[in-house]
Structure formats: structure tokens, C-alpha cells
């Protein structure tokens, strides 16, 4: 970790030069979030300096936001908001890297469909209206198509309850801005999609993580939090959860919905992965339609470049959501709406999703074969998998070791709500590999590391 550490040759005090040297390794990605730095005495002994100097250097690093001290756990590399692993949406262009850290569909079916669709758009009767302003909720014809698409899942086909957004993340931002005030408490799984953490920080909301098990959020923990914290809302990813891949059973959904109903807590349902799911389970919007804001979109199931999302909300709050969107962008691009509406209306969206599911099944089969000996949590049509690491690996150290060998994965710390490390695991995105061969190669490297059964020796020697 701090092998062969050399202090800069300048006139600054030794503690500042030590802080600079460690900070440089963090900036280069040699030290990643969650890794524990060696004890002060060990560093002092290896560099021939006194312990007080090391302590002052660590304090300087804390002031820079690069490390954090945790009682009983020592000093850890901090997870920075700007760090690549904390909220990443684009694959790395690093040469030779098979980047499985980004969640993306596994095929180019959307690109092929778009090439066929674009020449036809100018003949669409709605094309003439593309240069006009549209209501903040979105063009009426697009809302009708979206309501039909979501019928049976949310909204019962009622276009009047649909707001169209520039993707699900934009929808989530509008919902939080519309329905929560600075300082309000939002509940979520203790490990969950990073986007909710980023939004709560930016909007001054107090995000609290609740205990989970292999079936998702625990109803008893939700009940206790509602009784003591008086939360404004609970955020849930009920289908193919990101990152754990858990799909809440109907019983678990009903139990959580009952708690929300007893305490009048709004349910924010992020259901972007539902189209990939190969079974039917009632949504929270179906179980508690007047207490649930349902968010979905096409980016995860069709293509990330198709920034098109849906918010289905109770009529009592729909106007607030639309007003929040209007402040953002007035309304979504009608051109994007026309592209997406055509895909929904002519069945192309369904065909693309079928292709994605089949490709994911092939990739899941490779995963089961190569990592058969390890504790992998996943689902037949999930675009990602959650690898529980054996002793003595920790998420950040394993992600670093993988990257050094040409494979990108995301450690559990990137998904943690709060500052505690709650799982020693990494997320592996199966759809991100350019080909089945690349996926097999990357998984083989991961298996080789796991079979090695040991961490690199860390320390300043």
C-alpha cells in the first residue's frame, strides 16, 4: 500500500510532505476508498520519523477530505463525491481494461433499431409539433403511450398520472425536490443505488440506511425507523436491486407496504430493472397506489443513451412533481419522446428487451460456470451480480487488485448509505463486457484472485 513511499524533496515541513506523498497515491488510484492505512508507528518506523509527525500528516489528510478515522478501525481512505467509483456511469477508456463497473445493457439492439427508425420519423404525424413547447408533464401523445406501457404495473393506464422525465435519475431528482424539504429524513436500504445518496446530499436531505437481509429491507427495521425517526419517505429498488440483485417477494412487499401505510410514509419505488425481470410480482404502485411514487425508464433495459423516464404519482402530488420538472427544463425533449413513443407503440421496445434478456441469460451461465465455487448473489436475467468476498478480502482492496489485473468492478463501499462498511462484496456488471469472450476472461481473472486466498501485504516497508 505504502511500499517505497518517498517524500517530496522540498522545504515544506515533514508532516506536510508525508501528507502530499499519500495524497498523490490516492489521486493516482493506488489507494482506493475503504482501504485502511498502516498504523502510525509502522509508518514512522519505516520512514525514520516520529509518530507525532505521522499523526499531524493524517490530520492534514483528514482536513483535505482524503481520509477518515473510525473508532476501532483505524484510518481509512475516504470515499469522495468526485471519485470515479462513487457514482460512475460511463465505461473507462483505460487501455486493456475490461470494465465491469458500469451498469449497461448487453447488446446493440437499440442502436440497430434506431438506425431503422430515424428515417421514418419525419413522416410521423407528430413530427410537425417537435419545434413547439409542450406541457411540463410531457407531450400528451407520449404520456398515453407511456401509460399503456406501464398499465398493470403502475397507474392503471391513466395518462393523467404520468410525468415524463429525462431518465429515471432525473425523475428521482424531481420527486425528491417536489415532496421533501431540506432536513427531511429519507429511508433506504443500507446498501443501495448510489444516485439516491448523491441526490440527498445535493438537496440537503438526511438519508438513513436500514438493515437488509437476503430478501431486502427488513420490515421490523422499517417499522422501528418509522416509529422513531418520522421519515418523509422510503426509497426502494424492488426488482433486481442495484447492487445486490435481490427481487422483493410479494410477501416482503406487502409487509413493507403495510408499515408505510400505518405510518403514512411515502414509498418512492425505483423500478428501472423490472422490464428485465422474467416473472410478475405486484409493484408497490399496485399495492399502495395512493402512497407510492413509481419511477421507471428505458435506460437500464434498452440503452443508457435513451434518456427517457416515467414518474407515476398520486394525483395529490403529481402537480408538485411537474412543477419541479418545469423549473429544471420546462419539459423533456419532444424528439426523445417521439423516438421512445415509436419504440413503445410498434413493439420494438419489447423485442429489444427480449434480446437483452436472452443475452443476459448467456452471460449469467458463464458467471455460474466460472465462479461456481464462490458466493455470488444474482438472478437469471440480472445485468449485474453481487459477489460476497471470502476472508480476508475486503471490497476496496479486491477492486484495486482486480483493476491492477485489468478488470474493473465496484466495491460495496460505493453503495453504502452512511460511513460504515456493511458488506465485503463487489458488484460485477455482466452487460458491460464487450463480448462473451471478454466476460469469460474477466471472470477468470476474478476467480484466480479469489482462489489465491490472500491479500497483498500492506504497509510502509
What residue spans do the PLM features occupy?
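N-terminal basic, amphipathic alpha-helical segments
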Residues: 1-122, 126, 131, 142-144, ...
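Active-site PLP attachment segment
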Residues: 72, 288-320, 332-335
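Conserved core of the PLP fold type I
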Residues: 129-263, 274-293, 451-460
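Hydrophobic residues in well-ordered beta-strands that form the structural core
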Residues: 188, 209, 267-269, 340, ...
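Short hydrophobic/aromatic beta-strand micro-patches
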Residues: 312, 386-388, 429-431
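Amphipathic alpha-helix from the class-I
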Residues: 316-320, 338-355
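Conserved glycine-rich beta-strand-loop-beta hairpin in the small C-terminal domain of fold type I
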Residues: 357-368, 376-389
Amino acid at each position: 500500500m505504502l511500499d517505497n513511499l518517498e517524500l517530496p524533496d522540498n522545504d515544506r515541513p515533514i508532516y506536510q510532505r508525508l501528507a502530499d506523498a499519500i495524497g498523490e497515491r490516492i489521486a493516482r488510484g493506488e489507494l482506493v476508498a475503504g482501504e485502511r492505512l498502516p498504523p502510525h508507528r509502522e509508518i514512522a518506523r519505516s520512514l525514520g520519523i516520529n509518530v507525532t509527525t505521522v499523526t499531524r500528516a493524517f490530520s492534514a489528510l483528514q482536513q483535505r477530505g482524503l481520509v477518515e478515522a473510525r473508532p476501532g478501525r483505524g484510518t481509512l481512505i475516504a470515499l469522495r463525491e468526485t471519485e470515479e467509483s462513487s457514482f460512475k456511469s460511463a465505461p473507462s477508456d483505460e487501455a486493456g481494461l475490461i470494465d465491469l463497473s458500469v451498469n449497461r445493457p448487453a447488446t446493440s439492439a437499440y442502436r440497430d433499431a434506431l438506425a431503422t427508425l430515424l428515417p421514418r420519423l419525419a413522416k410521423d404525424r407528430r413530427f410537425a409539433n417537435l419545434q413547439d413547447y409542450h406541457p411540463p408533464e410531457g407531450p400528451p401523445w407520449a404520456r398515453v403511450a407511456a401509460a399503456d406501457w406501464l398499465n398493470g404495473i403502475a397507474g392503471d393506464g391513466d395518462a393523467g398520472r404520468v410525468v415524463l422525465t429525462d431518465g429515471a435519475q432525473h425523475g428521482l431528482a424531481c420527486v425528491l425536490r417536489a415532496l421533501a424539504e431540506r432536513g427531511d429524513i429519507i429511508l433506504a436500504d443500507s446498501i443501495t443505488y448510489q444516485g439516491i445518496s448523491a441526490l440527498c446530499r445535493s438537496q440537503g436531505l438526511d438519508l438513513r440506511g436500514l438493515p437488509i437481509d437476503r430478501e431486502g429491507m427488513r420490515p421490523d427495521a422499517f417499522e422501528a425507523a418509522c416509529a422513531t425517526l418520522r421519515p418523509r419517505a422510503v426509497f426502494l429498488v424492488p426488482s433486481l436491486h442495484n447492487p445486490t440483485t435481490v427481487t422483493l417477494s410479494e410477501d416482503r412487499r406487502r409487509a413493507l407496504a403495510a408499515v408505510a401505510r400505518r405510518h403514512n410514509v411515502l414509498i418512492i419505488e425505483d423500478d428501472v430493472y423490472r422490464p428485465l425481470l422474467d416473472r410478475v410480482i405486484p409493484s408497490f404502485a399496485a399495492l399502495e397506489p395512493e402512497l407510492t411514487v413509481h419511477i421507471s425508464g428505458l435506460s437500464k433495459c434498452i440503452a443508457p443513451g435513451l434518456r427517457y423516464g416515467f414518474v407515476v404519482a398520486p394525483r395529490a402530488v403529481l402537480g408538485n412533481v411537474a412543477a419541479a420538472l418545469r423549473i429544471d427544463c420546462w419539459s423533456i425533449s419532444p424528439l426523445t419522446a417521439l423516438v421512445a413513443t415509436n419504440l413503445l407503440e410498434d413493439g420494438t421496445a419489447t423485442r429489444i428487451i427480449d434480446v437483452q434478456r436472452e443475452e443476459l441469460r448467456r452471460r449469467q451461465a458463464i458467471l455460474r460456470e466460472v465462479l461456481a465455487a464462490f458466493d455470488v448473489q444474482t438472478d437469471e436475467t440480472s445485468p449485474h451480480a453481487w459477489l460476497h468476498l471470502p476472508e480476508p478480502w475486503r471490497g476496496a482492496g479486491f477492486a484495486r487488485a482486480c483493476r491492477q489485473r485489468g478488470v474493473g468492478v465496484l466495491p460495496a463501499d460505493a453503495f453504502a448509505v452512511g460511513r460504515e462498511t456493511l458488506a465485503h462484496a463487489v458488484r460485477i456488471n455482466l452487460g458491460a463486457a464487450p463480448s462473451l469472450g471478454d466476460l469469460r476472461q474477466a471472470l477468470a481473472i476474478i476467480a484466480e484472485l479469489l482462489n489465491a486466498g490472500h491479500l497483498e501485504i500492506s504497509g510502509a516497508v
